[in-house]
């Protein structure tokens, strides 16, 4: 199972379906991992500050992860040994694929709803509330996700 998966592919979806239960969660945080879940382990950040969930691969395996998908580049010698476990699957450029992998695992919920993104420096919260309110008046239930929280507009 340790053959390199260079890009997201149908084979990765099939691998997840074969080795993880349908109710398994995908996580990069071992504190949230339960037996049977799938760990996504990869470095994130920039030159000044990096966080690397790959250091938790041994813990994920001991907690009973069904699979560990990990970024294989620049892996320490210790982790190279740990990742010989058949539950570990190297995925090149994993950080760039997490959104697609997660979306596919959850049957792409955003494909079945209208999503409106608001960008800019000022006024995003106000505009999001206005849009949600306008949609609600048309009997289109709306939720808002932003820096002030997330939820349905009453």
Where do the protein language model's features map onto the residues?
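Phosphate-binding loop of NTP-binding sites
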Residues: 96-154
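N-terminal leader/targeting and accessory segments in enzymes
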Residues: 1-100
């Amino acid at each position: 199972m340790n053959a390199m998966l260079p890009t997201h592919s149908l084979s990765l979806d099939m691998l997840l379906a074969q080795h993880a239960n349908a109710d398994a969660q995908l996580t990069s945080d071992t504190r949230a991992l339960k037996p049977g879940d799938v760990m996504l382990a990869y470095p994130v950040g920039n030159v000044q500050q990096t966080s690397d969930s790959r250091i938790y691969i041994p813990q994920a395996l001991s907690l009973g992860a069904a699979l560990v998908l990990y970024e294989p580049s620049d892996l320490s010698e210790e982790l190279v040994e740990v990742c010989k476990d058949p539950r570990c699957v190297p995925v090149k450029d994993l950080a760039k694929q997490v959104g697609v992998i997660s979306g596919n695992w959850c049957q792409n919920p955003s494909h079945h709803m209208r999503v409106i993104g608001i960008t800019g420096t000022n006024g995003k919260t106000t505009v999001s509330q206005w849009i949600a309110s306008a949609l609600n008046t048309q009997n289109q239930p709306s939720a808002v996700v932003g820096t002030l929280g997330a939820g349905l507009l009453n």
